[in-house]
Structures are given as structure tokens and as C-alpha cells.
């Protein structure tokens, strides 16, 4: 078999799409405190956009509270400003180098918007998985055309690729269902 078709590579790329989806889901506000909520936020630190988790320790002491212990006292105001301007509706309370970030409950309309956004993220992941499937199928067709595979081998490998795709899409749908239930939970 040639290097052009590698089932492990296809599986790795599909898993990557699912992992990317999980990271996007972690950044969605559900009304429950989560360190992942702050991960997408970048702070202008010393002239460079820096991920917030590189500027302090993030912890979740209570279900509706995130604390952020900023290491450099000169960065506390910049971190506070970045969180307030992030668009996720959080208002930190400064206590020296510690920021307390209460998580307000979500109203029904906002929950529906976030659930819809989660659906969009899942659709992007499905498209990524289908693109990986297409790449695998194209490689198999090319190998058959070049004489590296018989028609029967190509069909068998195509079924394997389709099976991988179905499993990946099923995992995406399970993640989406779980996240939407979490979002809609009052």
C-alpha cells in the first residue's frame, strides 16, 4: 500500500476536529463556572496578546465563581479590562492581585443563543470530518486508478473510511447533545 492513504492519519485528523470542538465548547458560557471560560481571552501583556492562563492561576472555588490570581501586580488592571471587554458578560471584582469573577445566571433567551452557537460549532466539526473523509476517499480512488489497489480493496478501505466518519460524527453529536443539555439546565 502507498503512503497516500493512511487510516491512522485520517483517524488522527478526525479526532483533532472533535478535540477542537471540545475546546470551543469549553469557551461557551453555561451559567456554571469553568476555567475554560477564560481560555479564549487574550490580554495585551507587554505589547503582546497573551492567553490569560499564562498570566495567573485560574481556579473554580464555587459553582458560580472563578478566581484568577494574577502573578504580576502590574497586569491586574489589564487582565480585568480584557475580561470585561471579552463579550461574555463577566465583571471581575479586584482584591489586590486576586480577581473574583462571579458567573451570573443566564436568561432563557441567552441560553437559546448559546445552544444555537454550540450547534454551529458542531456543524463546523462535522464539515471538517467530512473533508477528511473526502481526502481519504480521493486517495483511495487515485491508488485504484494508479493500479496500487484492486477495486475490491478500494471498496473495503472505503467502507473503513465511512465507518470512521460515522463514528466521528456520532461522537460530535453526542458532545453537542451533552453541551446543549448543560446550557439549557437552569
Swiss-Prot record:
Write down the InterPro entries for this protein, in alphabetical order. Ribosome_recyc_fac (IPR002661), Ribosome_recyc_fac_dom (IPR023584), RRF_sf (IPR036191)
Q: Which terms in the Gene Ontology molecular function aspect does this entry carry?
A: ribosomal large subunit binding
UniProt keyword list: Cytoplasm, Protein biosynthesis
* Recorded superkingdom: Bacteria
Q: Where does this protein reside within or beyond the cell?
A: Cytoplasm
Q: Does the keyword Protein biosynthesis apply?
A: yes
Which GO terms of type biological process are on file? cytoplasmic translational termination
User: Chief location of this protein?
Assistant: cytoplasm
Q: Which SUPFAM superfamilies match?
A: Ribosome recycling factor, RRF (SSF55194)
Q: Name one GO cellular component term.
A: cytosol
Which positions, given as ranges, span the membrane? none
Q: Name one Pfam family in it.
A: RRF
Summarize the protein's role.
Responsible for the release of ribosomes from messenger RNA at the termination of protein biosynthesis. May increase the efficiency of translation by recycling ribosomes from one round of translation to another.
Q: Which family does it belong to?
A: Belongs to the RRF family.
Q: What is the protein's given name?
A: Ribosome-recycling factor
The gene coding this protein? frr
Amino acid at each position: 500500500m502507498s503512503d497516500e492513504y493512511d487510516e491512522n492519519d485520517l483517524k488522527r485528523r478526525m479526532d483533532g476536529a472533535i478535540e477542537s470542538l471540545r475546546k470551543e465548547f469549553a469557551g461557551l458560557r453555561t451559567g456554571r463556572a469553568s476555567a475554560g471560560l477564560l481560555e479564549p481571552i487574550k490580554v495585551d501583556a507587554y505589547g503582546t496578546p497573551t492567553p490569560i492562563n499564562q498570566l495567573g492561576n485560574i481556579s473554580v472555588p464555587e459553582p458560580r465563581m472563578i478566581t484568577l490570581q494574577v502573578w504580576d501586580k502590574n497586569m491586574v488592571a489589564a487582565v480585568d479590562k480584557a475580561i470585561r471587554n471579552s463579550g461574555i458578560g463577566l465583571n471581575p471584582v479586584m482584591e489586590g492581585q486576586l480577581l473574583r469573577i462571579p458567573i451570573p445566571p443566564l436568561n432563557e433567551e441567552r441560553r437559546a443563543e448559546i445552544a444555537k452557537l454550540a450547534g454551529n460549532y458542531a456543524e463546523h466539526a462535522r464539515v471538517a470530518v467530512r473533508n477528511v473523509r473526502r481526502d481519504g476517499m480521493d486517495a483511495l480512488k487515485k491508488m485504484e486508478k494508479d493500479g496500487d489497489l484492486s477495486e475490491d480493496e478500494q471498496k473495503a478501505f472505503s467502507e473503513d473510511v465511512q465507518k470512521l466518519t460515522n463514528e466521528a460524527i456520532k461522537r460530535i453529536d453526542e458532545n453537542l447533545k451533552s453541551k446543549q443539555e448543560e446550557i439549557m439546565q437552569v
